[in-house]
Regions:
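C-terminal, non-catalytic "cap/extension" segments appended to globular domains
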Residues: 1-4, 9, 13, 17-20, ...
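Active-site-adjacent "gating/activation" loops or surface patches in catalytic cores
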Residues: 1-4, 9-78
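Short, hydrophobic/aliphatic alpha-helical segments
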Residues: 53-56, 95, 258-260
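A generic, residue-level signal for flexible/boundary positions that often mark functional hotspots
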Residues: 54, 66-68, 94, 204, ...
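Conserved helix-loop functional segments at active or binding sites
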Residues: 62, 90-97
Length: 288
């Protein structure tokens, strides 16, 4: 690997080999922007056991000097947790066929393992563990945590509405029953009028530059993933311990290990004991 990259052997608590994880944190000329997870080798168990080789790739600024570590913004910390969730999905897979192992799941389910990790990133109990002053080691003060939480609630009514309007517009395009040509602007106006979108709130993407409409009507999956991750994290909170080992074991066995080998909602209900509720997401957004 590149000298900047770190390689880890991931093991079970008893020492058994799980897989290899590469962490490539910093930008360089040959890398594109953004952050992502890749599977260099997917897990499988057809005839012989094949362990996964996974990478997390980010573009975090390098340390400014020998005595200064790489300092992450809160958004970057969330990105790190998010991509690590995808990595866990790939590493902890226990499927027979690599075609359905790891992150090879329906598109509206693939973000659950990543987005649920962001809940720990923003939890005050966890932040006081990792969000520390790089010189003094002092944990982030509660006043800053409160401000971060308040900023997360800001304008959520507007943001949620524009996202949902775009999702409904996308779905309208993909549920048309005729092949007649339509004027995109007229179709958009008719659709948004039907759902009652007020003029003061514009759909997140106008039709002429709404690239997602060419990807199979999946734009709703972004919001649906939020419903799933908020409800799944609620399962941990309900135990009174967000690190509850039994609940974590259930999430691993029923979600992470299964990949796309079974129906996604069946797996979710097996973990959660019920269908996902929208209430935890509304509460997290400050809408209820």
């Amino acid at each position: 690997p590149h000298p900047d990259a770190l390689a880890f052997e991931v093991k079970e608590a008893n020492g058994d080999h799980i897989g290899i994880l590469y962490m490539d944190f910093h930008p360089r000329e040959s890398k594109r922007s953004g952050a992502w997870m890749n599977s260099y080798r997917k897990q499988s168990a057809l005839g012989k056991k094949v362990s996964p080789v996974i990478t997390n790739v980010c573009n975090f600024t390098k340390p400014a000097g020998e005595d200064v570590p790489a300092l992450l913004s809160f958004d970057e910390a969330q990105t790190l947790f998010h991509e690590f969730g995808h990595a866990l999905h790939g590493l902890l897979s226990q499927c027979t066929y690599n075609k359905v192992s790891g992150t090879s799941v329906p598109r509206d389910f693939v973000e659950l393992p990543s987005q649920i990790m962001e809940n720990w990133a923003s939890d005050p109990e966890v932040m006081k563990i990792y969000a520390r002053h790089y010189q003094t080691g002092e944990a982030i003060p509660q006043s800053l945590i409160d401000k971060l939480e308040a900023s997360g609630h800001f304008n959520q009514g507007f943001v949620t509405t524009e996202f949902m309007a775009a999702a409904l517009l996308d779905m309208a395009y993909h549920t048309r029953t005729t092949t007649d040509l339509v004027n995109p602007n007229e179709f958009e106006k008719t659709t948004l009028d039907k759902i009652g979108l007020i003029p003061e709130i514009m759909v997140r993407y106008r039709s002429p530059y709404f690239q997602h409409i060419f990807a199979g009507g999946y734009y709703y999956a972004y919001t649906w993933a939020e419903v799933l991750d908020a409800d799944a994290f609620e399962a941990f909170k309900e135990t009174g311990n967000i690190f509850n080992p039994e609940k974590a074991k259930s999430f691993r066995e029923n979600i992470l290990a299964k990949g796309g080998s079974e129906d996604a909602m069946t797996l979710y209900k097996r973990f959660r004991g019920q269908e996902p509720s929208i209430e935890p997401l509304l509460k997290r957004k400050g809408l209820k």
